Amino acid sequence: MKLAYWMYAGPAHIGTLRVASSFKNVHAIMHAPLGDDYFNVMRSMLERERDFTPVTASIVDRHVLARGSQNKVVENITRKDKEERPDLIVLTPTCTSSILQEDLQNFVDRASMDSESDVILADVNHYRVNELQAADRTLEQVVRFYIEKSKKQGDLNLTKTEKPSANILGIFTLGFHNQHDCRELKRLLQELGIEINEVIPEGGSVNNLKNLPRAWFNLVPYREVGLMTAIYLEKEFGMPYVSTTPMGVVDTATCIREIEKILNSFDKDVVVDFESYIDKQTRFVSQAAWFSRSIDCQNLTGKKAVVFGDATHAASMTKILAREMGINVACAGTYCKHDADWFKEQVQGYCDEVLITDDHTEVGDLIARIEPSAIFGTQMERHIGKRLNIPCGVISAPVHIQNFPLGYRPFLGYEGTNQIADLVYNSFTLGMEDHLLEIFGGHDTKEVITKSLSTEEGLTWTSDAQAELSKIPGFVRGKIKRNTEKFARENNISEINIEVMYAAKESLNA
């Protein structure tokens, strides 16, 4: 446990609540002290939905600590069962309430006797896993619970659908452009003649989970959530799954070819061939392929970028920049430390260095050291970019409200390639704006601000030196300022004047 004002992946209970609140008619009860119950506010603020967040906090207060939690938790479960009539109630502790070491499974068993809803305890170790791992585990637990329940009741339908069909696993609330990606994936599959069997957990009903085995295969667009469920369904029913993220022209084609291979393994008499579809989409529907050969994109060739995000988006973005756009990825990184080996394997050969960390200060220092032309990362990298005056395109959760757009903005499939091409190009070209404004005027040019992440104490700039610095074009000013301050520190100079600036310049050129 560590104190931090920014976390890339939140605590485990947030992952459980994201999965539970994605399903229809599922209620989550969080056994937590005040302060851990911010999920409702966060989801209500960010997700553009009309429904209330179906999460209730069963608060651990001094009365609970004195008497024990059982009565309060059981009472909350049975009360919500009567009020909401949900299909399922999920009870989850938080890392704080886990310290109490209570037998919550016993509370669940007790509440189940008086509830018409199914009641389960989220089977997650709150000290060992983060938000994404917990979400993956909770989704698999819910699926397993209802598959086992259907087996006992004898109504599990294992007959495959007449036409090829797929389940999409892992689309859920607060995900990065998940709703838009889901629409694009549905469109893609329908154009390939594949029906959608179930989409879980977003908008899905737990009563339909028994129909999951009817699909011909499972599609897992994001590694972070859905993979455990796909592996369970493969082990239990021999269902194949595709886990290649269809992001970018190359990987979308790879994903479609994997689907083609699965469909052809089912019916030897009817052979499907999606090559003509891939060719048509790549050449005429996706604008990204011809854009990457245009003079606009060639201007970006060799430009330096830093990529950081969850494993899925950061790996895909790195490959798109390096392989499809000719951009030099100086560093690719992820905060998914549990998936470090897969990530390193994916980005091998596409970047100069790899960073695996969940500490935002490490990422900030690396960006300040590399000084890329653009950053592609999370909301935190956007903040870092603003402080360093480096443009940033947001490509991964965690994100703020501006990355829950009302318009259609998928990142997957062929329409996603267009969105990514726009994002990349706009991230780079807007960097010239300050420079052009300074040359042609029209705005008050802003004061020279410190562009370093850690403020340099004990260094003062004379007014002459500041005036000289303001004459330098904006897009290199930050670099020159940092180099001059570094030179001054190394030579124990506390006041920076014009002579020091020129001496620093000469020392770099030497």
From Swiss-Prot:
Listed EC numbers: 1.3.7.7
UniProt binding sites for substrate: 431-432
Cofactor notes: Binds 1 [4Fe-4S] cluster per heterodimer. The cluster is bound at the heterodimer interface by residues from both subunits.
Active site: 296
Cystines in this chain: none
GO biological process terms on file: light-independent chlorophyll biosynthetic process; photosynthesis, dark reaction
Annotated InterPro entries: ChlB/BchB/BchZ, LI-POR_suB-like_C, Nase/OxRdtase_comp1, P-CP_red_C, Protochl_reductB, Protochlorophyllide_Rdtase
Residues that bind [4Fe-4S] cluster: 36
Pathway note: Porphyrin-containing compound metabolism; chlorophyll biosynthesis (light-independent)
Alphabetically ordered keywords of this record: 4Fe-4S, ATP-binding, Chlorophyll biosynthesis, Chloroplast, Iron, Iron-sulfur, Metal-binding, Nucleotide-binding, Oxidoreductase, Photosynthesis, Plastid
GO CC annotation: chloroplast
A Pfam family annotated for this UniProt entry: PCP_red
Reaction catalysis annotation: chlorophyllide a + oxidized 2[4Fe-4S]-[ferredoxin] + 2 ADP + 2 phosphate = protochlorophyllide a + reduced 2[4Fe-4S]-[ferredoxin] + 2 ATP + 2 H2O
Protease among keywords: no
Molecular-function GO terms, alphabetical: 4 iron, 4 sulfur cluster binding; ATP binding; metal ion binding; oxidoreductase activity, acting on iron-sulfur proteins as donors; oxidoreductase activity, acting on the CH-CH group of donors, iron-sulfur protein as acceptor
Names of required cofactors: [4Fe-4S] cluster
Main location, first listed in the record: plastid
Record carries keyword Cell membrane: no
Chain coiled-coil ranges: none
Localisation per UniProt entry: Plastid, Chloroplast
Membership in a protein family: Belongs to the ChlB/BchB/BchZ family.
Subunit structure: Protochlorophyllide reductase is composed of three subunits; ChlL, ChlN and ChlB. Forms a heterotetramer of two ChlB and two ChlN subunits.
HAMAP family: ChlB_BchB (MF_00353)
Function: Component of the dark-operative protochlorophyllide reductase (DPOR) that uses Mg-ATP and reduced ferredoxin to reduce ring D of protochlorophyllide (Pchlide) to form chlorophyllide a (Chlide). This reaction is light-independent. The NB-protein (ChlN-ChlB) is the catalytic component of the complex.
Protein name as catalogued: Light-independent protochlorophyllide reductase subunit B
Organism: Chlorokybus atmophyticus
